[in-house]
Amino acid sequence: MFNKVIMVGRLTRNVELKYLPSGSAAATIGLATSRRFKKQDGTLGEEVCFIDARLFGRTAEIANQYLSKGSSVLIEGRLTYESWMDQTGKKNSRHTITADSLQFMDKKSDNPQANSMQDSMTHENFNNAYPTNYNAPSQDPFSQAQSYPQNAYTKENSQAQPSKYQNSVPEINIDEEEIPF
């Protein structure tokens, strides 16, 4: 079966970092994401989704070092189901994301150390601390695209034939201050 989640959201709280008995880092983050839609009566509605994500290994340590409440991130991973009994014997459950990779989405800061870390995380997969039964990809997924044949498409060809849709798409100007979280 295919189980892949890609989510962009903002942290709802600071990173909670712990170390497992094996010495590997494990972190939990809370994400909030929203979707805007038009209701039947024509008014705009908004649906907000809150979900926890689990990070492991170096990814957990980097998240703890550079992220805080309100930071914007992109998480790629898989959906997992957790169930447990509380102290009163009541059964509880929830879905979480077990992250395979993490990308910072905020604007680059004035901190050169954070900038270089953000650049290096864009194409890397930090999943070195998963249990041994998890089959992590052994190579960079972006490098696989180079093995496919490329079409003879050049910039000159694209400019020689103007698209009939070229001027029909309106430009959207979104101010980050207008984002609700």
Swiss-Prot record:
It comes from the Bacteria. The keyword Repressor does not apply. One of its GO terms (molecular function) is single-stranded DNA binding. GO terms for cellular component: nucleoid. Residues 107-181 are annotated as: Disordered. Gene3D superfamilies: Nucleic acid-binding proteins. Residues 111-170 have a biased composition (Polar residues). Transmembrane segments: none annotated. Residues 1-106 form the SSB domain. Keywords: DNA damage, DNA recombination, DNA repair, DNA replication, DNA-binding. The keyword Nuclease does not apply. InterPro entries: NA-bd_OB-fold (IPR012340), Primosome_PriB/ssb (IPR000424), ssDNA-bd (IPR011344). A motif (Important for interaction with partner proteins) lies at residues 176-181. GO terms for biological process: DNA recombination; DNA repair; DNA replication. Homotetramer. PANTHER family: SINGLE-STRANDED DNA-BINDING PROTEIN (PTHR10302:SF27). Plays an important role in DNA replication, recombination and repair. Binds to ssDNA and to an array of partner proteins to recruit them to their sites of action during DNA metabolism. This is Single-stranded DNA-binding protein. It comes from Helicobacter pylori (strain J99 / ATCC 700824) (Campylobacter pylori J99).
